[in-house]
Amino acid sequence: MNHESEPSRSLRLGLCCIFRDEPIKFRNTTVKFLRSMDRDAASLKLSTLCLANADALLAALTFCDTAGIGCFRINSQILPVKTHDECGYDVADLPDGPEILSRFKACGTFAKERGIRTSFHPDQFIVLNSPKPDVVDRSVAELEYQAEVAEWVGADVINIHGGGAYGDKPSALAAFARNLARLSDRARTRLTVENDDVTYTPADLLPVCRNEGIPLVYDVHHHRCNQDNISIEEATEQALKTWQREPLFHISSPIEGWDGPKPRRHHDFIDIRDFPECWRGMKLTVEVEAKAKEVAVLKLKRQLAEQWFVYILRCADGSLYTGITNDLDRRLSQHNAGTASRYTRSRLPVVLAYQEKQPHKSAALKRELAIKALSRTAKETLIIQSNV
């Protein structure tokens, strides 16, 4: 199986499952509702929902292609109640079975042609290392269902958490590793594991990933909440080594900030300061776990594309002026036109004496304050050193 997504890109951002503003909806149902119908009516209802969700998936992928979003995470309920003991079904047995399969495969063809990666992230009830055999049985069944759809659409990632520790992490991780043997090849080769915000850190999971050949989906928010003895940079480096295809990581920000009472809760948007500097420029997929969904992804995309600079101008009277901008040429023109700063307005013309790139606006503001606090001699030294 070829897991590579074409065409190759550098950093790509991923949208997770649903939309905030776009009128693209995935449909679901309940076991209670299906039980209220006779068998044929329930089968027809499920068939209709599956067709609608295949069409919604194509619409989602089309939006991603148009918006320049490089990855889409598919909802685990794309085939509603697929593995339920009573109401579960095989797609082939539904009234529109062949058409459902055809439409999902068309989604896979579209995604491949447009270079859009797809992934799955099963719900938290997937626990491969549970001490309860029935929980493991249901987890395996759910992973197999998602692997079936993943094969249709060309998704290369089915991501899960490590599960519980049950008072003994080594034994729990050993059970996780043993139960991998229960998975089919199409599920096993797509399986990834993610560090969580309570139990398993990157340091806990990396040995299992290396021994079992499972890629680590590094979640930097979870790592900041559930820390170990390795840095973000080292965790990134070690996680990258577990991948034989394009790595996939997660980013999110705490809704109440890192000093808030519940830092695990996700914000509507990503604070650009939370995006690891070492991720920039990598050939990497970063799924954006933010409540504002596509709006948050597109905002982060714009922010990552921005270039911020701290600069020093030498004015006509010999004085120095320090500022920040995300458009250096335009800002210099504004200064010389007398529309940028009251200080430089009476000291024209000005020339650019020093510039320093920063990853985002907050970093630029911080650096600006540091440079402003320097003595005149120290600023001149900075200018001289930059020209050497």
Where are the predicted features?
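Short, conserved beta-strand edge motifs with alternating hydrophobic and charged residues
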Residues: 161, 192-194, 216-221, 250-252
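Active-site groove signature of glycoside hydrolases
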Residues: 153-167
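Histidine-centered catalytic micro-motifs
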Residues: 118-126, 216-224
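Short acidic, Gly/Ser-rich segments with clustered Asp/Glu that frequently serve as metal-coordination loops
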Residues: 200-201, 221-227
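Alpha/beta catalytic barrel-like cores
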Residues: 2-117, 124-139, 148-153, 182, ...
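Multi-pass alpha-helical transmembrane bundles in non-GPCR membrane proteins
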Residues: 169-180, 191-194
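GIY-YIG nuclease catalytic motif and its immediate N-terminal context
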Residues: 305-388
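Active-site flanking residues adjacent to catalytic metal/cofactor-binding acidic residues
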Residues: 120, 193, 218, 288, ...
